[in-house]
Amino acid sequence: MHRSKRLFAVALIAASCVTQVRAADWGLKPGKVELKSAGALAFGPDGILFVGDSTAGAIYAIDTGNTKGAASAAPLNVAGLSAKLAQLLGVAEADVKVNDLAVKPESGQVYLSIKAGNPPQAALVSISADGTLAKVSLDNVPHQRAELADAPDSAVGRRGDPRDDAVTDLAYREGKLLVAGLAKGESPSTVREFAFPFADAATATNIEIFHAAHGRVEDGAVVRAFVPLVIDGEPVLLAGFTCTPLVRFPIKALEPGSKVRGTTVAELGNRNRPIDMVVYEKDGARYVLMANSARGVMKISLDKVGENPGLTEPVKGGGTAGQPFETIAELPGVEHLALCDDAHAIILARSEGGSLDLRTIDLP
């Protein structure tokens, strides 16, 4: 064998061994992952990707391998992404739906959760730093699975199937995976906590909010997007709901079997659904950047958000109140966003012609 080929083979074997050891450290074992659906995504330690599978009522932790590179490398831009996804997956472009995206901190690779085809199938797709797309093989990958013991039963109703919202968003924080979604019971809106590696069953907390646009307290409104952060020294969840209250929850209050009412720090307008949220700092101030279904991309100030006493009166007529924000007119059509580094984000945006494009942007 040529010396360069031998060295390459040795390098591949070494990389494989490192991956196997790293995966074993987190309790991951090789095997086939059979996704019934692929929804919310979040990265944890050592390039481990968490995938919410609402249909199966489960969370997967999947080793994605390569951890070399940097999220702050050259900007990643892929025009006509929807057409390229369709070609990669062998389906019509109209039958491709991106459910979420996440940026791998160690390498800068972008991962997408996909619903593709008719009937639809779940898939994961990675995009490398040079823009190359690849379907993530799940045939024999180190992974671990955690069950949602209290996932809602499937039942199609006026507001859709609650099972589809068993997992709506994920975030990894200090050895725990936080999972928002719906559960069985009379107070279905829930935040679950899984210790990772997965061992024990999740702890679950029912949550309720004052929904200013509706003028009432609700415990059935599901969290659509959230971010964990520290405000005035206290770890909190900042969560966005449909129609569009922004609510603060102290993480220390999320106790098993309890019911916690959050503080509604903003009402951002009705007939809208938050899609993704990221927290960043610019010019010494902190902000949330939030993509929405109908109200564009919002830059929300976190100034004095810890002191905000919360809204207690109705906000009618599609109005707004609470934390100040601005809508970023330069970012139309954004369907998903994720933080890339301290100064940049990755967005998926729909062009006027209907194409879905991936772009790297400066944080506004």
Model regions and ranges:
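Bacterial N-terminal signal peptides
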Residues: A9-C17
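Short, low-complexity interaction segments enriched in Ser/Thr/Pro/Gly
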Residues: H2, C17-T19
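Bacterial N-terminal signal peptides that target proteins for export
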Residues: M1-F8
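Sequence/structural signature of beta-propeller domains
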Residues: R22-P364
